[in-house]
């Protein structure tokens, strides 16, 4: 795992325990309590699913500088969170988020682009 300078991790943050080397966190990032960052997914942990139909995913996660992940966020494998983007409480991010965006919901969706005047 790579962590930049001046980052703040609140209690109970979980960063992928199996592939932590696939997680990169930029400078000045804040991660709220009970947030989870996964660099892999393993749908075949369910014995009733056929492994060929649901392959294991292992992919890098990149959280760029200045991003804020509010409490309870889940970031899935292969996602990039853009610079200075804000992920709202409890959001589940399954796809890349551009720079300077506000994301809400499950699945997470961009609801606002932050102008440079607001930063």
Label every PLM stretch briefly.
Residues 1-7:
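Extended, small-residue-rich solenoid/repeat segments and analogous flexible loops
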Residues 9-80, 106-107, 113-115:
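Flexible, glycine/small-residue-enriched loop-and-beta-strand segment within the central core
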Residues 42, 80, 91-92, 98:
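Flexible glycine-rich beta->alpha loop in the catalytic core of nucleotide-sugar glycosyltransferases
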Residues 87, 105:
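Conserved G/P- and acidic residue-centered "switch" motifs that form tight phosphate/ATP-binding loops
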Residues 95, 112:
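Short helix N-cap motif at coil->helix boundaries in the Bergerat
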């Amino acid at each position: 795992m790579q962590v930049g300078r001046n980052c703040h991790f609140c209690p109970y943050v979980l960063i992928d325990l199996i592939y932590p080397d696939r997680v990169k966190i930029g400078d000045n990032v804040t991660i709220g309590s009970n947030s989870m960052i996964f660099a892999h997914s393993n749908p075949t942990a369910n014995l009733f699913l056929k492994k060929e139909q649901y392959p294991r995913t292992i992919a890098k996660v990149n959280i760029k500088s200045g991003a804020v992940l509010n409490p309870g966020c889940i970031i899935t494998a292969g996602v990039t969170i853009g610079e200075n983007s804000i992920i709202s409480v409890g959001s589940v991010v399954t796809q890349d988020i551009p720079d300077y965006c506000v994301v809400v919901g499950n699945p997470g969706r961009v609801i606002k682009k932050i102008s440079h005047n607001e930063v």
